[in-house]
Amino acid sequence: MLSERARISTIVGLFANPILSFSAVFGNDFWRFGFELTLDLVNRIITKANTVLSLITEDTTTTFSIDKKASLFTASYYQRLHSKTVCGAEAKYILSDKSNSFSIGKRHLFGDDDLIQALLSVSNGGSMRVLFQHHWTLKSFFTIAGERLLNHSSQRFGLAVEL
């Protein structure tokens, strides 16, 4: 830990191809800037390079990121509507195939203790996702999730219990 407003981390992985990973986050209560860089020490190439800038207020978070060695650009915006509801939107641009994606979503907490949450998201690719989750304790919960690909008429459904 560098200070209250900055964090720096370095990792050296001793594998068949040793890596050196360096990440840092700087900021204050209104903005944060972070980056991550991973080097393959044998081949002397950059295997990972990510950077992110976040602007934060009491009820909103706006984030801009450049990931996968500048091949993925993402912008996201989250707005707290009230204490139990959050809405968000995310736009992505993939440089390699020049494709865009956009999704919007909402999360709502239920009950006096906020142990039940529901999430709904829709994307321009024609997918709709729903998740319901009930926390019994801090680390135990039950989840029901589903996804429907509207343009392919396919769906997925899942149940999970973690104790």
From Swiss-Prot:
Matches recorded under InterPro entries: Porin_dom_sf, Porin_Euk, Porin_Euk/Tom40
GO (cellular component) term, any one: mitochondrial outer membrane
GO MF: voltage-gated monoatomic anion channel activity
Top-level taxon: Eukaryota
Family, similarity comment: Belongs to the eukaryotic mitochondrial porin (TC 1.B.8.1) family.
Protein name per UniProt: Putative mitochondrial outer membrane protein porin-like
Gene source species: Arabidopsis thaliana (Mouse-ear cress)
